[in-house]
């Protein structure tokens, strides 16, 4: 059995959050400090990567200090029983965090500011310093836990999403070619499927960026970088495929395109060969069909007629070329 089964059951990030909360509470209690403010800071500081934790933590600390400062200031002016204290503390904290470009720390700063108001009483300086210290404890603890415990590995998620993207792309390309053969240039169904694929590929690229950040902060073997580069190249090819696919989905309204019998057969064979990649694991070349479409494009360029048709066939050939290179 996998010795890391618990990570699949709970989630590494959840485990790290729990550890960070526990250690933060231990440190604060050992120093006789109220742990709640440090825990709030620790919870929001756990990020997908160690780099993100360090960068955002660097901005959250001054934001928290700002929030604590305004809480003390307005409690001194209006007392802890006034609605103005809460409203002005939150408003000015948000305003200053925005002006100083500390937006990533706004949430924890506002929470800290509002939570500490009832306990300030007359100990203004002490509460300000203690809240600042607890914020530092929360930031440092969660940052170290995120860096040292269960360094994120997104390879599995990336490969899974890439495979899903491939399958959806190939299927949509096949279905879209069927629509074009039947002269259905506008298709809400294809547009919806395209948006789903586009969003899925964005998720892939986000995970790849997370993994690249993680590798840059940890000493990793050359094979890790090699695998990441392979996944990056695959995602880049998918991005190009999706771009060309969009160009045969989003076509001008009120246009008509008619294909000859040979052109329809060529589109059918090319789209079928691409759809079957997911099932066969290989790419069947359709050289004769490709040549048919190339000849049509050349003829249209000479005559200068039906540019939409030429555009569609060109995009189909570009998609074919991408996969021809991938499976060369």
From Swiss-Prot:
GO cellular component: plasma membrane
Mitochondrion in keyword set: no
Topology of the protein relative to the lipid bilayer: Multi-pass membrane protein
TM segment ranges: 19-39, 61-81, 108-128, 132-152
InterPro entries given in the database record: ArAE_1
Keywords: Cell membrane, Membrane, Transmembrane, Transmembrane helix
Subcellular location: Cell membrane
Pfam families, alphabetized: ArAE_1
Recorded superkingdom: Bacteria
Primary localization class, coarse: membrane
Family of the protein in this entry: Belongs to the UPF0421 family.
Miscellaneous field: Disruption of this gene leads to an increase in hla (alpha-hemolysin) transcription and proteases production.
Protein name: UPF0421 protein SAOUHSC_02103
Organismal lineage: Bacteria, Bacillati, Bacillota, Bacilli, Bacillales
